[in-house]
Amino acid sequence: MPEKKGSADAKVLHCSFCNKSQHEVRKLIAGPSVFICDECIDLCNDIIREEAQATARAAIRSELPTPAEIKTFLDQYVIGQTSPKRMLAVAVYNHYKRIRHGEIKGDEVELSKSNIMLIGPTGSGKTLLAQTLARMLNVPFVMADATTLTEAGYVGEDVENIIQKLLQNCNYDVEKAQRAIIYIDEIDKISRKSDNPSITRDVSGEGVQQALLKLIEGTVASVPPQGGRKHPNQDFVQVDTTNILFIVGGAFDGLEKVIRDRTEKSGIGFSAAVRAKSERGVGELFSEAEPEDLIKFGLIPELVGRLPVVATLDELDEAVLVQILTEPKNALVKQFQKLFAMEGAELDVRPDALKAISRKALKRKTGARGLRSILEGALLDTMYDLPSQGNVSRVVLEANAVEGVGKPLLIYADESEAASGEKAGRGEVRDAAA
């Protein structure tokens, strides 16, 4: 017979963990010969949640490459630019750490995004740095040219086309696209034409900056599915850009003058100003860039504020260009040696030829970007003839061939072709024009 409520003989149940009675707690849940109260359940949940968060934080640290590891990877492909590489490594590490941090529930601290601006001369490695970062982190990457962008409604591409390209790159996997890296090149070409707000509509300058602003700071962009055109009754793909890392780059021709004018205002006397101008190069001046200089150059203050990490790249000198030709993992000379090896020939680029190529690139003011066209031009005739000549074992490129006053030397493996007087087995050295 069940005990009556309020009976003196009624057994009072207690929590098996905290020993509180059933009258001191809201709920007491029974198990096989044990009881647990709602307060102990809450405590257990808190302990499990804390352990899960600690595990998640440890996973973040273990999965993400450290800034030092990121820089080491960049060193394999990009020569020099130590300071920009360190800044990029820290910024990218913090960005993806921030994304993982946002996945941990229960943390009230919200971390803001730090997008990146790269300032440097043409061919100094801005695009290569961004591409190499994306490859290391195994995230989608898309590159856009700011000069092709116009305000929505005008002829040209609007800023949402960038997101459309990104989706196409990752097969419309929205989750993957929302962790991508977007590089916008030639950002300096959309600077407004004067310091004063535009009176007339500037559809490819300040207007584009305003459109980019929303995308960079984080918004939900509506993109037509599978690259279709927009129309009112269409279902759009929604992409949140909050966790997309934006890197913008530009040569900023003329910015050095803005910086020089600001920094030399305090100079006393004519000789001080002249000496300062002669001693400081473009790269050194760029390193002194302040937000006010970028605004004076023509970027709107809101956009400058959304790009807090500013990395300036140095000008490339002859020695660095020689290193770029030979040292990176996918160095240009190594690429051409691979092409020649496919034809059974060894390519030997002499040190004087490397210097001649570098000097030519400096003269053209194309930086590292011009190295390929110069090397290709020097070897073009040889690459044309080589597949038809099966007995060439070695091609030697010297400075005179780069400068256009000679041709690469061909060394033939067939001893019967050797000129009289040459030692047997030494092979014949012939001019490529022969």
Swiss-Prot record:
Zn(2+) binds at residues 15, 18, 37, 40. GO terms for biological process: cell division; proteolysis involved in protein catabolic process. CDD domains: RecA-like_ClpX. ATP binds at residues 121-128. It comes from the Bacteria. GO terms for cellular component: HslUV protease complex. ATP-dependent specificity component of the Clp protease. It directs the protease to specific substrates. Can perform chaperone functions in the absence of ClpP. Belongs to the ClpX chaperone family. NCBIfam families: clpX, PRK05342.1. This is ATP-dependent Clp protease ATP-binding subunit ClpX. The gene is clpX.
